[in-house]
Amino acid sequence: MQKKHGITNMQKKHCITYIQSTFGNTIITLTDYNGNTKTWSSSGSVGFKGSRRSTNYAAQATAENAARVAIQLGFKFVEVRIKGLGYGKESSLRGLKLGGLIITKIRDVTPTPHNGCRPPKKRRV
C-alpha cells in the first residue's frame, strides 16, 4: 500500500456506510473516510411508497441499490454503522452483501438514554 497525500490505496476502496432504520423508512448513506457523502439511497427513492417502505424487502432493495452505486464509484470494502430500531436492520446488511460489497466491521450506534427525560407528575384526582 503506497501512501499518496496521506491516503492509502486501501482507504480509497474502503467506505463507511450509515444505515438509519426507522419504523417508517430505511436510509443508507455511503461516505468516504473523511465523512464526505458519496451517495445515498432510501426505500422511497428506490420506488416503495406508503407502508411498503418499512418492510424488510424494501430495506434489502435499498441496500442492494446503494451497493451497486458504491461498486461503480470504486468502493469494495464497507464499514457499517447501524442506527435505529426499525425492521430493516438485518435485511439491509444482507442487501449490502448481496450487492457485492465486503463488510469489514459492524457497529450499532443507536442512541440510548442513560436515564431519559423526567416523567410527568402523578395525576391527582
From Swiss-Prot:
Whether Ribosomal protein counts among this entry's keywords is: yes
Q: Name one Pfam family in it.
A: Ribosomal_S11
Q: Where in the cell is it found?
A: Mitochondrion
Q: What are the protein's UniProt keywords?
A: Mitochondrion, Ribonucleoprotein, Ribosomal protein
Identify the InterPro entries for this entry: Ribosomal_uS11, Ribosomal_uS11_CS, Ribosomal_uS11_sf
Q: What is its main location?
A: mitochondrion
Q: Which family does it belong to?
A: Belongs to the universal ribosomal protein uS11 family.
Q: Which PANTHER family match?
A: 40S RIBOSOMAL PROTEIN S14/30S RIBOSOMAL PROTEIN S11 (PTHR11759)
- What name does UniProt use for this protein? Small ribosomal subunit protein uS11m
Q: Which organism is it from?
A: Marchantia polymorpha
Q: Which gene encodes it?
A: RPS11
